[in-house]
Amino acid sequence: MRVSVFAVGRMKSGPERELVERYFDRFAKAGPPLGLEFAGVSEIPESRGQTAQLRKAEEAQRIHEALDNAKSGGAKSGGTSSGGAALILLDERGKTLGSEAFAAIVGRMRDDGKRQLIVAIGGPDGHDPALRSRADLVLALGELTWPHQIARILIAEQLYRAATILAGHPYHRS
């Protein structure tokens, strides 16, 4: 299963970017024996719309287009079908999971035959309700609100951690 991260906004160079790249590199090396291939990060430009609602709708449209391209014949709305793409949205109002539960979900998506997993980090205004309804999972990284750069670091580390959990590697200590 190919794993992609879609992020609204750009990650500037600096220590945060280096840390994100380090964890994605680890995930890219740990994933293939488990059937997980890291396909990279796609940066989606922030909308310049006048209102939060318009900005969220424009950013959601860009994510919808990328998801439709990735699905290669899967369902167009209301979740995804077996063999298509799965969508996980990061959102402060999402479900809070532990690392082992997150790893189990990633493993189940892979085992169910999903060809692609897309993890989407929204813009400063969050995600459009239509995109939220389309997601297979809306996930919160805890109850705190995180800057987008830190959210990228956290999801990069959690994807790597999920791979190590699925592999039975001792990186994760429960």
UniProtKB/Swiss-Prot annotation:
GO molecular function, one term: rRNA (pseudouridine-N3-)-methyltransferase activity
Compartments reported by the entry: Cytoplasm
Keyword Manganese among record annotations: no
Keyword Cytoplasm: yes
Assembly behavior: Homodimer.
Record-given protein name: Ribosomal RNA large subunit methyltransferase H
Reaction(s) catalysed (UniProt annotation): pseudouridine(1915) in 23S rRNA + S-adenosyl-L-methionine = N(3)-methylpseudouridine(1915) in 23S rRNA + S-adenosyl-L-homocysteine + H(+)
Family to which this protein belongs: Belongs to the RNA methyltransferase RlmH family.
PANTHER family: METHYLTRANSFERASE, RIBOSOMAL RNA LARGE SUBUNIT METHYLTRANSFERASE H
GO cellular component terms, A-Z: cytoplasm
Binding-site residues, S-adenosyl-L-methionine: 90, 122, 141-146
Chain's role: Specifically methylates the pseudouridine at position 1915 (m3Psi1915) in 23S rRNA.
EC class: transferase
Keywords of this entry: Cytoplasm, Methyltransferase, rRNA processing, S-adenosyl-L-methionine, Transferase
EC identifiers of the protein: 2.1.1.177
